[in-house]
C-alpha cells in the first residue's frame, strides 16, 4: 500500500506538494520522499486524467513540474523521464529551456518547456511498495 497521505493508481503512489521550488530541488525532494520516487512521468491519458483529479483541487496553480527534462541539450538533445519510462511523444523545445511542466490553462494536458531554475509546485510518484 501507499503511505497514508499518498494516492494510489495503477501500481503507483502519487502525492501533490503545494510548495514551489526549482525542478532540480523538486526531483531531489521526490527521491527523498519514497523509495524509487521521482517527479511524475505521464505514460497514458488515463494517468493524465488521474493526475488532474488529484492535483487540480489541491493546487489550482498555473504550472506544475513533471519529470521530463532535456539532458545534454547542446550535444544530442536526449529527452527522457526521470524514471526512464518510454517517451511517447516529444514536445517542442524552446531555446534555453530544459525542464517541462503542465499548464493549468490547458487543463494540465499540455507539456510546456520551462526554465529549470524557476519555482513551481510539483507531483511526486513512486511504485507501490511490495
Curated annotation (Swiss-Prot):
It comes from the Eukaryota. GO terms for molecular function: toxin activity. GO terms for cellular component: extracellular region. InterPro entries: C-type_lectin-like (IPR001304), C-type_lectin-like/link_sf (IPR016186), C-type_lectin/snaclec_domain (IPR050111), CTDL_fold (IPR016187). It holds the Pfam family Lectin_C. Belongs to the snaclec family. Shows greater sequence similarity to the beta than alpha subunits compared to other heterodimer snaclecs. Interferes with one step of hemostasis (modulation of platelet aggregation, or coagulation cascade, for example). This is Snaclec B8. It comes from Macrovipera lebetinus (Levantine viper).
Amino acid at each position: 500500500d501507499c503511505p497514508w497521505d499518498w494516492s494510489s493508481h495503477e501500481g503507483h503512489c502519487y502525492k501533490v506538494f503545494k510548495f514551489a521550488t526549482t525542478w532540480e530541488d523538486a526531483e531531489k525532494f521526490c527521491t527523498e520522499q519514497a523509495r524509487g520516487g521521482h517527479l511524475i512521468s505521464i505514460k497514458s491519458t488515463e494517468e493524465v486524467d488521474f493526475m488532474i483529479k488529484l492535483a487540480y483541487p489541491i493546487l489550482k496553480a498555473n504550472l506544475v513540474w513533471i519529470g521530463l527534462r532535456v539532458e545534454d541539450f547542446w550535444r544530442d538533445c536526449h529527452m527522457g523521464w526521470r524514471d526512464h519510462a518510454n517517451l511517447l511523444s516529444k514536445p517542442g523545445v524552446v531555446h534555453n529551456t530544459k525542464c517541462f511542466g503542465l499548464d493549468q490553462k490547458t487543463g494540465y494536458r499540455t507539456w510546456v518547456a520551462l526554465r529549470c531554475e524557476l519555482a513551481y509546485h510539483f507531483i511526486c510518484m513512486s511504485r507501490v511498495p511490495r
